Amino acid sequence: MKILLLGCNGQVGWELQRSLAPLGDVIACDFDSVTDRRADFAKPAAVGELIDRIQPQVIVNAAAHTAVDKAESEIDLSRTINAVTPGVIADRARALGALVVHYSTDYVFDGSGDQARDELAVTGPLSVYGKTKLEGEERIRASGCRHLIFRTSWVYAARGHNFIKTMLRLAQERERMTVINDQFGAPTGAALLADVTALAIQASRPLTGIYHLAAAGETTWYAYAEYVLAKAKQIKP
């Protein structure tokens, strides 16, 4: 099986290199890869040409513009990376008969209510990030390609930028921090996402559609920060 992994150097992409390796020939690409394997999501046509050249059977897209606040001032770039390029990927996949695995977010919802949302819940993103990620989902679905879209939340990993690392850094820099306590979510390990992805690709019954994929339980950003800092204090230098 030939697998094209896009966004291989991010939190999820790095773990996917590990989990996908036993499945076949993994061609791992990112925006800073060597010339013939560069996958610059700001250039949709170039990503399409990369797919045409490699001719994969599975395309796993772990690339995204994930800076939620920054996306508000980089609307065009966010839309290109999160929506337009995934649409190009899906169109190429349909032509090849390839499977597309794509990662989305809980930001496609409006954040109201106090109950977990299922896959049939009505979407209503409020942020540029959420709107562009939802458009990416819609473009993939409209393409007619076989696809798996995993919506997840609060991703963390040893590699890359995430809430845990931000809290640890700020704790060293500041005497006091302010963290909100009214937003709930499920911190989800990139390793979990990668392992489930590998299992889904190998499933005896072909899987398609949108799935919510997050760790069990819930917490607030405040409780999450408290937990992280408490654990950090237990580590002996």
Regions found by a protein language model. Name each.
Residues 6, 29, 62-63, 100-105, ...:
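SDR active-site strand-loop-helix element
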Residues 196, 203-237:
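Mid/C-terminal beta-alpha module of Rossmann-like enzyme folds, strongest
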Residues 3-23:
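N-terminal Rossmann NAD(P)H-binding glycine-rich loop of SDR-like oxidoreductase domains
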Residues 41-81:
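NAD(P)H-binding glycine-rich loop region in Rossmannoid oxidoreductase-like domains
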Residues 16, 51, 167, 197-201, ...:
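Hydrophobic "lid"/C-terminal helical patch
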Residues 73, 80, 84-88, 95, ...:
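Catalytic helix-loop patch of NAD(P)-dependent Rossmann-fold dehydrogenases
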